[in-house]
């Protein structure tokens, strides 16, 4: 839907979280390596909220503790340590991580803090073993320029990343601590963004600055965007975990649709004199003989069926508020998160779940349900069902007032779902185990004098210096392999930089699409490959097969890969002999077509010689030998 975003008073702010590609973690010497092999062990914990320095307890922390979830943490003996498991004090802050934070701050025109103090930010969703995240305020009051105008940068913080979620059960969550402690930059903008397109452009520009440092991780999950969205007569909504830049625009559009729809529903509910009753009624006996598989499943597990009455809500619970999501989905999300139930049912949709019309009418009569009223059911264990319905009652009451402020989770389709209330300010307190860091004038000067080349400047240089076309230059500048490209181009001047760039960007992607793990390749492999090419040990046509050889046999040297694959480069004389043999085998075609047989013969030559000789040499040799044969007839 097209909206007048200015008239709606749309305001959007971003929080960008970017992992840094440092040698060690922020507070220990473990590598910043994410693993997917079998962990070496597990520990279990329960986390509980505690008071801040001001004697307050954060409401989001209280909510999480009500879930009574057990947290399981996987670890590795060789790449994680006791710091991640919260059994050893943190070490000093990673100097590499801090320098990168200061560098990015400078590129965004920010003012450094004179002293950097490590703080503890309370987290009780289990994603930190300690129940808090260590974070430090580095800089403030900056700005970036975009094609839509200037966007102010509020702050930049350096913090530790959280654990990686492995599994989420009803009563437990399993994490791996390999990600915990990886240095993470948190960049927060002011709510200066006034359209979905501007939101996407702001995130793209910040991402460009981050990649310019050459010190950030790449790939899915290494950058996460949180988007704060509000409109007039709406509420501030924090959308967590947008991993795809292209999704930001759609997330903003759909959240605007959601808030506009919820405001319209509020007006309709008020017009109906809608009311939410607090009473939770047990209807287990009433529906004890139902044939509904969903309800019977709960009853077989010694569950109960509980119900609430929403006066004036009939026909509105099924109203769409986002593409494919309804007001009932909003209620269901609350019940799932706060009650731990699988879902809920309402009278507008009950026949879909195998509940008969007769049972629906009986239920409505039992609940004193009027024509405009609706009933919501939950079938589960007694305590879960009651917790879920209490959450639904609260959310239904909020729908009569307006839009609740909350934190929502980004979904892959551009929609969002309820996660938790917006956190309060009572979740931060000082870290006493790490000393403060002074940012001296010498440090500031060193950072300013060693700033990286910005992508726009580097693109122009690549076009001039390496003779790349504009598209390839832009692609190479934004590549994780940009430093490797420059090193190889300077080391092997007899190889065209275009070939090196194409190999690093296009060839590797093509091989990855074939299902091969290109992560196995090291810089040493690629260096050896181009060394072999520069020494005429192989042809450029052999590059894809050599790379595949390295992937399948990472410990092999180039000569071994070439030998196994039969790709050792032929001499000119050997190429001539093969081509003459092919011409003689197809002499009848040559006699009939003369030079017109070139295309057919070239295909047969390449079938035998591809990867063993340069295509140009094969083509020239074939032309010459074929001409000799034709003229000699």
Swiss-Prot record:
The keyword Ligase applies. The gene is gatE. SUPFAM superfamilies: GAD domain-like (SSF55261), GatB/YqeY motif (SSF89095), Glutamine synthetase/guanido kinase (SSF55931). It catalyses: L-glutamyl-tRNA(Gln) + L-glutamine + ATP + H2O = L-glutaminyl-tRNA(Gln) + L-glutamate + ADP + phosphate + H(+). One of its GO terms (molecular function) is aminoacyl-tRNA ligase activity. PROSITE patterns: GATB. Its EC number is 6.3.5.-. One of its GO terms (biological process) is translation. Belongs to the GatB/GatE family. GatE subfamily. Keywords: ATP-binding, Ligase, Nucleotide-binding, Protein biosynthesis. NCBIfam families: gatE_arch (TIGR00134), PRK04028.1 (NF003107). This is Glutamyl-tRNA(Gln) amidotransferase subunit E. One of its GO terms (cellular component) is cytoplasm. Allows the formation of correctly charged Gln-tRNA(Gln) through the transamidation of misacylated Glu-tRNA(Gln) in organisms which lack glutaminyl-tRNA synthetase. The reaction takes place in the presence of glutamine and ATP through an activated gamma-phospho-Glu-tRNA(Gln). The GatDE system is specific for glutamate and does not act on aspartate. It comes from the Archaea. It comes from Methanococcus vannielii (strain ATCC 35089 / DSM 1224 / JCM 13029 / OCM 148 / SB). InterPro entries: Asn/Gln-tRNA_amidoTrfase_suB/E, Asn/Gln-tRNA_Trfase_suB/E_cat, Asn/Gln_amidotransferase, Asn/Gln_tRNA_amidoTrase-B-like, GAD-like_sf, GAD_dom, GatB_C_1, GatB_Yqey_C_2. Heterodimer of GatD and GatE.
């Amino acid at each position: 839907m097209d909206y007048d975003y200015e008239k709606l008073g749309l305001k959007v702010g971003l929080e960008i979280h970017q992992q840094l590609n440092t040698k060690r973690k922020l507070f220990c010497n473990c590598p910043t390596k994410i693993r997917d092999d079998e962990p070496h062990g597990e520990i279990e914990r329960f986390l509980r909220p505690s008071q801040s320095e001001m004697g307050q307890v954060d409401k989001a922390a209280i909510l999480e503790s009500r879930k009574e979830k057990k947290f399981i943490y996987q670890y590795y003996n060789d790449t994680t340590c006791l710091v991640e498991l919260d059994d050893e004090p943190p070490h000093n802050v990673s100097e590499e991580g801090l320098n990168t934070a200061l560098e990015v701050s400078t590129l965004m025109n920010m003012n450094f803090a004179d002293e950097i103090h490590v703080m503890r930010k309370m987290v009780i969703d289990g994603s930190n073993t300690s129940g808090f995240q260590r974070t430090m305020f580095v800089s403030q009051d900056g700005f970036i320029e975009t094609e839509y105008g200037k966007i102010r940068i509020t702050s930049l913080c350096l913090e530790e990343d959280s654990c990686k979620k492995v599994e989420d059960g009803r009563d437990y969550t399993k994490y791996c601590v390999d990600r915990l402690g990886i240095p993470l930059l948190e960049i927060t903008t002011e709510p200066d963004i006034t359209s979905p397109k501007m939101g996407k452009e702001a995130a793209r520009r910040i991402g460009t600055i981050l990649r310019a440092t050459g010190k950030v991780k790449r790939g899915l999950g290494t950058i996460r965007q949180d988007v704060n969205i509000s409109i007039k007569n709406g509420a501030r909504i924090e959308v967590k975990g947008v991993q795809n830049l292209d999704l930001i625009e759609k997330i903003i559009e759909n959240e605007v649709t959601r808030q506009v729809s919820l405001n319209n529903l509020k007006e309709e509910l008020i017009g109906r004199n809608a009311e939410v009753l607090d009473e939770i009624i047990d209807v287990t006996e009433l529906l004890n003989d139902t044939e509904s598989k969903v309800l019977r499943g709960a009853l077989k597990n010694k569950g109960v069926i509980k119900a609430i009455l929403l006066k004036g809500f009939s026909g509105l619970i099924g109203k769409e508020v986002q593409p494919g999501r309804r007001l009932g989905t909003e209620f269901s999300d609350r019940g799932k998160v706060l009650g731990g139930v699988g879902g809920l049912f309402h009278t507008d949709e009950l026949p879909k779940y195998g509940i008969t019309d007769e049972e629906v009418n009986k239920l409505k009569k039992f609940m004193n349900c009027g024509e405009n009223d609706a009933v919501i059911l939950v079938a589960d264990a007694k305590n879960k069902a009651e917790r879920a319905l209490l959450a639904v009652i609260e959310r239904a009451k909020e729908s009569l007032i307006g839009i609740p402020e909350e934190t929502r989770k980004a979904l892959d389709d551009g929609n969002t779902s309820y996660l938790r209330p917006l956190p309060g300010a009572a979740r931060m307190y000082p870290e006493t185990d790490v000393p403060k860091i002074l940012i001296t004038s010498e440090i500031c000067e060193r950072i300013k004098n060693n700033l990286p080349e910005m992508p726009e400047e580097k693109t122009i240089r690549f076009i001039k210096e390496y003779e790349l076309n504009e598209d390839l230059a832009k692609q190479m500048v934004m590549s994780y392999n940009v430093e490797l490209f420059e090193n190889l181009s300077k080391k092997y001047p007899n190889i065209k930089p275009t070939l090196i760039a194409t190999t690093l960007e296009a060839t590797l992607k093509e091989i990855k699409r074939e299902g091969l793990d290109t992560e196995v390749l090291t810089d040493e492999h690629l260096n050896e490959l181009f060394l072999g090419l520069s020494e005429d040990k192989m042809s450029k046509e052999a590059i894809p097969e050599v790379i595949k050889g390295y992937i399948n046999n990472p410990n092999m040297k180039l000569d071994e890969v070439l030998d196994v694959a039969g790709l050792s480069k032929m001499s000119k004389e050997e190429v001539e002999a093969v081509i003459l043999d092919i011409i003689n085998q197809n002499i009848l075609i040559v006699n009939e077509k003369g030079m017109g047989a070139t295309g057919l013969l070239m295909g047969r030559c390449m079938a035998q010689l591809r990867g063993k000789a340069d295509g140009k040499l094969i083509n020239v040799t074939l032309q010459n030998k074929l001409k000799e044969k034709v003229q000699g007839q």
